[in-house]
Structures are given as structure tokens and as C-alpha cells.
Amino acid sequence: MAAAEQSVDGVDRRALTQYLTVLEDQGRVRDCPGQYLVVSQSGSEYLIDARLEACECPDHEFRDRECKHLKRVAYATGQREIPPIVDRGDVDDQLGEHCSGTPRWSR
């Protein structure tokens, strides 16, 4: 396993532990494969295009970096493995609950 997959930065931690709901095939992303809505605890909603690795949040748009919303979609759908150094008890219980993918834990 690559070293990058073993490390977890602050953005990864927030993506895994904060209350963020990933929705697919609902609202603005209905019938749009590869697109998701991520809703935060505050009610903010962001459109994610996983194929283009794009998010409409200010963090992604203005800082040109992979934001917690993009990472949350990747973890929730199983596109990215959750590193083994992450404590399962710290991960949001609802990770992957509202999308067809399944979160994957690295071994």
C-alpha cells in the first residue's frame, strides 16, 4: 500500500468524522451519474462531480485543493479506502448511508 494511503491529514479527518451526508440521485443530481450532493450539519449543500473531481464549495474553488466534500464522497462510495490508522470509532456512523457505494477499510 502506498504511503499516501497510510497517512491522514486534517481534511481527511474532517471528511471522515464530521456530520456530512452524501446524497446521490436526488434533487439537483437526479439522473446525473458521478454527481453527488453533500449536506453539512449546518444545512449547507454542495454539488460534487466525482468524475471531474470538482466541488462548488469555496475551499475547493478558491484554494484549488481537494476539499472535505470531495474526500467524503470518495470515502462514502468506496472509491477511496479508509486508512488503517483511522479509529473506526471516530468515523461518522452515517458514512455511506445514503449512497449506493460501500465504504472500504484498508487492511
Where do the model's predicted regions map?
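Long, low-complexity, compositionally biased intrinsically disordered regions
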Residues: M1-R107
